[in-house]
């Protein structure tokens, strides 16, 4: 059946209703080469008056199809970008670098939801000695976020990424002076850190993360990738442990 594009809002509902086995009068229209918008809308109205519960069924069916299609596309994208996810030399690695499962985290230092999972990430690193964690700086919340991401990647050059990362995650102040002070407290050279923050490779690494996030359909932080699963949002430790166990099992 071809339907006038002007009827698109009603058309997808009609197609869902038809898929659920809606009444015969609709089938009588299917032989026509094209249905105008007014006719489609009238068919939908008639169906709604006769069997309103079909609307919910059609919507649920559409949502299931959309969710399945989104999951399929994400898995394909994860497979296509596997090297960028787990093997990018510009992305710092925590936990066991030789671990048997890799957990990738996309985050922003100003993101309240990212801060919620800090304790879970620290606990996972301590408890699971075979877990490898890849940190993907994804500063999306303004200038302070970008500055903190640059500083963290610069700290990697001094071999202090992980402690500096977690310190930034719990710091309320991400100003230049606060970052310098934090670096000094953790035994980094603040002057060297500041110099390295402006290295072009640092911005290139962040830009690569932006592109990768877009490829994967990541729309916010935090987001996690384990195996072929992408999990958005501040998931709890138990959920992460289950995903890691699934990846390890199979």
Task: Label every model-predicted segment.
Residues 31-45, 182-250:
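C-terminal cap of thioredoxin/glutaredoxin-like
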Residues 88-92, 119-120, 210-211:
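A generic local structural motif
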Residues 33, 37, 41, 48, ...:
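Solvent-exposed, acidic/flexible segments
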Residues 2-3, 12-15, 21, 25-83:
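N-terminal targeting signals for export/organelle localization
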Residues 104, 109, 115-189, 194, ...:
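Structural alpha/beta surface segment adjacent to cysteine/selenocysteine redox centers
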Residues 10, 16, 81, 106, ...:
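Intrinsically disordered, low-complexity proline-rich regions
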Residues 83-101, 125-126:
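A short beta-strand-turn-helix
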Residues 1-6, 103:
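N-terminal secretory signal peptides that target proteins for export/translocation
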